[in-house]
Amino acid sequence: MIFAVDVNGLLKLWLVFSAIYRQTVATIQEEIMVLHSTRWLALAYFTYFFSYGIFLPFWSVWLKGIGLTPQTIGILLGAGLVARFLGSLLIAPRVSDPSRLITALRVLALLTLLFALAFWAGHTVAWLMVVMIGFNLFFSPLVPLTDALANTWQKQITMDYGRVRVWGSIAFVIGSAVTGKLVSLYDHQAILAMLTLGLISMLLGMLLRPSVLPQGQSRQQEAAGWPAWKSLIRQSWRFLACVSLLQGAHAAYYGFSAIYWQEAGYSASTVGYLWSLGVVAEVVVFTLSHKLFRRWSARDLLLLSAVCGVVRWGLMGWTTALPGLVLIQILHCGTFTVCHLAAMRYIAARQGADVIRLQAVYSAVAMGGSIAVMTVFAGFLFQHLHQGVFWVMALVALPAMVLRPRVSAQVNPQA
């Protein structure tokens, strides 16, 4: 009888502790696992661009470190660019329901990590080709889908996009700087290790639950397929042409500025500082975008970006003096950042699934395809015209002044 009483007492004690445990776990999940939506978005940008800050500057160094020739490296990087273009254009638009954006981001982050882990498995050219294509195919849609999530949340909550997106720029600087230091200490092996850690962090961050889930109208069945795309392109072709010219004009800078400046007598460290200056200028404008451009329309921002492009690329072909290069790099906030802010403002004015579709086309065509195509031409022009390639880039940016969309997207006080 005494034993029975003891069992009952223990049972009651167990029930009490179970209730306390469940309540504690629920509290922890509520307080820790749930992240404010703007912080969730900032973390997503940070972890993505931290990883991209490793991949973009240093992946060719890793490929060279495992013994590949420059020609083979070029082929692999070219295949990656094509995969990035296709990933943004074909995968991102498949997410037609804004409420499924977070799930899509988590799946893509997982697939990207799996392909990054596959780089550890082998170094044959055939294997690397498959892995490069798979990695870029799933890595590239993360940006347009994250931007689409930002646009969706701007309709639901008060959010300063520039102050959120700036964490991506900060992360890019940190990722490239830390990896550069580690490469000097541990050679190329540090690159893949850092990339893997960055992608693990990205996946873990995206597994957290945002405080506000995205909501919106999913794509209607009758609007699906080619008619929806045809209508979108017909309505937005001026916008797409404009941003493609402005972003594509960066091709010579991305591909050949380091070579050009080193040939002019600057050390590799100085070239690195100049690149960092451009990103710092980008960070400043993203941070202050709400105050600086709150009343600017997308059309006005595109004009400012085009003017900055003509001035920047013209100066780059004209001088290699250090004061001129400092000004050239500060203008990065005008040629890239202002253009991107204009694009986000224009896209945010769309409705429903058009936000996701146009975001995907912008990322694929302007941020991917145009730069890839212009890089091919820039290589030919740099070989034959040398610094004259930057004058050509200034001419590329010039038509954007007249190609700006006639109907301005609405001014968004939160963008």
Task: Give the ranges of each region predicted by the language model.
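Helix-loop boundary and gating motifs at the non-cytosolic
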Residues: V34-L81, S236-C242, Q247-G272
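Juxtamembrane intracellular "pre-TM" segments in multi-pass secondary transporters
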Residues: L35, P210-V243
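Hydrophobic core of transmembrane alpha-helices in multi-pass small-molecule transporters
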Residues: F46, A126-L142, S244, G324-V338
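Helix-to-loop junctions at the C-terminal end of transmembrane segments
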Residues: G87-R100, V183, V285-S297, F382
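Symmetry-related core transmembrane helices of the 12-TM Major Facilitator Superfamily/SLC fold
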Residues: I191-L207, V389-P405
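A late C-terminal transmembrane helix in Major Facilitator Superfamily
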Residues: I356-F382
